[in-house]
């Protein structure tokens, strides 16, 4: 008798768990779909140095208020080992093409500003860092699902290339040259 009761409870918990996962999953998919299929999304990236960048997403095209340079947006976290390993290479590329290109880091975590500043100092990051809710909105529009993810845009706001994981500096260099032409 105890076995039957246990079995019934187990089955109820199993089906309840599965159904709530499906509900969460469908809600999440709906949120993503509405965000990526929206005709007009505007937001502002806020940088630790006080600078702001206005971003507009309209009919699956991006425009940035700063059109002087090509941009490599790097989505990452403080706990991601490949993200940390990529930093010296990104510093090199940011310095090499500083007149026509910039690396922009977007943290996808809600750390306190002081924690992020400590991370930047410890890891010797030499490129702008954006923090805040807009980073999450931008990552949803671009369907970022893992870190590190990097997305390269030319100065006109056209998406050139997307990368997932640790990418060799030489490969990034070649694509950056294409983006700044």
Residues covered by each model-derived region:
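N-terminal targeting signals for export/organelle localization
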Residues: 1-53, 181
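A short beta-strand-turn-helix
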Residues: 44-71
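Loop/turn elements at helix/coil->beta-strand transitions in domains of secreted/extracellular proteins
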Residues: 67-70, 99-102, 126-128, 155
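Short pre-active-site segment immediately N-terminal to redox-active cysteine/selenocysteine motifs
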Residues: 69-71, 76-79, 146
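Hydrophobic beta-strand anchors of alpha/beta hydrolase catalytic cores
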Residues: 72-73, 103, 150
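Thiol/disulfide oxidoreductase modules built on the thioredoxin-like
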Residues: 122-126, 133-177
């Amino acid at each position: 008798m105890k076995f039957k009761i246990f079995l019934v409870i187990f089955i109820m918990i199993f089906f309840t768990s599965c159904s709530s996962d499906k509900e969460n999953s469908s809600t999440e998919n709906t949120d993503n779909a509405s965000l990526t299929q929206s005709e007009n999304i505007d937001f502002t990236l806020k940088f630790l140095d006080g600078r702001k960048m206005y971003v507009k997403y309209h009919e699956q095209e991006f425009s940035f208020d700063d059109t002087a340079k090509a941009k490599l947006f790097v989505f990452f976290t403080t706990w991601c080992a490949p993200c940390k390993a990529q930093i010296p290479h990104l510093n090199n590329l940011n310095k090499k093409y500083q007149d026509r290109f910039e690396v922009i880091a977007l943290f996808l975590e809600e750390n306190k500003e002081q924690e992020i500043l400590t991370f930047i100092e410890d890891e010797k990051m030499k490129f702008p860092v954006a923090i805040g809710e807009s980073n999450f909105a931008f990552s949803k529009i671009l369907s970022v699902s893992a870190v590190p993810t990097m997305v390269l845009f030319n100065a006109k706001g056209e998406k050139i290339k997307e990368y997932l994981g640790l990418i060799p500096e030489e490969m990034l260099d070649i694509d950056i040259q294409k983006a700044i032409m």
